[in-house]
Every structure is written in structure tokens, then in C-alpha cells.
Amino acid sequence: MDKKTRLKLDGVIVCEGKTDQARLQQLFDVSVITTNGSALNQRTINLIKAVAKKQPVILFLDPDVAGQKIRRQLEQHLDKYESCFIARKDMKPNSTKIGVAEATDAALIQALQQRQVFTKTTQPTLSWEQYLELNLNSKSKRLALCNKLHLSYFNHKQLFRKLNLLQLTFDQVCQLLK
């Protein structure tokens, strides 16, 4: 896409590396901060925290172990952030790597359109007892819910935490499960 047809985004995207940055700026008119992969340092964390006070921060990290680790590390420092998720199936055909730079244009655009806002709260919107009532005992049920929310897969404790960060109530989750 040329500069005239790139989609304008509000906020700053946080991604892992320079190839991710180049790929995102090829499609979107947006500022990008890179973490330099798993070499995320306190200086970069402080920069992201400062930016988050003034404009939306969008975490757009690879769907691999390193990307999940960076995401968890940044989540600890941010009170509010937006998050995009891409799946392994969203990679370009014949791609040997799995990441933002290797995802299809359509997958990147869709992930940004379906991004979720996460907010730390002192009062959970969903209790552990309510969560257990949802009967998300099987991985397939949790995966189906994660897919409806455009999230990567999470285990029980992680999903419970994410649902609260999304500020979803018991009734809202029940509606999603129908």
C-alpha cells in the first residue's frame, strides 16, 4: 500500500522488531515502538508507560512463546491497553516463521479492527465462583470463547484474569457462550 492508501490508526503500536514495524507501517499510518524482541528493557517499558498516559497503546506481538512473554511483561506495567491477536493460521502461505511480519494483510487489518481494550480494575467484574459456574472445563470451550473475543488461547487462571481485564460480567460471558 502506498502512503495515501494506508489506514490511519489512533494510538501507538508496540511490536517486537524492525521487520514487524516495517510490515505494520506498510499497511497503517501509525507510530510504532519496538521491544527489540525479548531484549525488552526498562527504558523501553518506561517509554511505553509514558505514551500510554497520553494515547492508546496497542500491543501487537507475535503468537509465540516470546511474544506471550513480552505481552505478560508489558501488561504488568500498563493500567489500560489495547491488544491484537493473530493466529498461526493467519500466516502467509509457505512462511516458515510465525509472527506479525509474516501475517497476511487481511489478518493484520482484521486483528486491528477486532482489538480488545484491557483495563486494570481494583474490583473484579467476575468472581472466581461465577467463572466456575461458566463450566469452561474443557480446552475446546475456552478456545471457543477466546475465539469469540478475538484472543489467543488461555488456561483457566489466565482466562479468568483476561475476562476481568476486559471488564466482562457473568451475564455478558454467558451471552458469548450461547
Swiss-Prot record:
Belongs to the ribonuclease M5 family. It catalyses: Endonucleolytic cleavage of RNA, removing 21 and 42 nucleotides, respectively, from the 5'- and 3'-termini of a 5S-rRNA precursor. PROSITE patterns: TOPRIM. Its EC number is 3.1.26.8. It comes from the Bacteria. It is found in: Cytoplasm. Keywords: Cytoplasm, Endonuclease, Hydrolase, Magnesium, Metal-binding, Nuclease, Ribosome biogenesis, RNA-binding, rRNA processing, rRNA-binding. Mg(2+) 1 binds at residues 16, 62. The keyword Hydrolase applies. The keyword Acetylation does not apply. GO terms for cellular component: cytoplasm. The lineage of its organism: Bacteria, Bacillati, Mycoplasmatota, Mycoplasmoidales, Mycoplasmoidaceae. GO terms for biological process: rRNA processing. Its main location: cytoplasm. Gene3D superfamilies: 3.40.1360.10. Required for correct processing of both the 5' and 3' ends of 5S rRNA precursor. Cleaves both sides of a double-stranded region yielding mature 5S rRNA in one step. SUPFAM superfamilies: Toprim domain (SSF110455). Mg(2+) 2 binds at residues 62, 64. This is Ribonuclease M5. It is an enzyme of class 3 (hydrolase). Residues 10-103 form the Toprim domain. Its cofactor is Mg(2+). Binds two Mg(2+) per subunit. It comes from Mycoplasma pneumoniae (strain ATCC 29342 / M129 / Subtype 1). HAMAP family: RNase_M5.
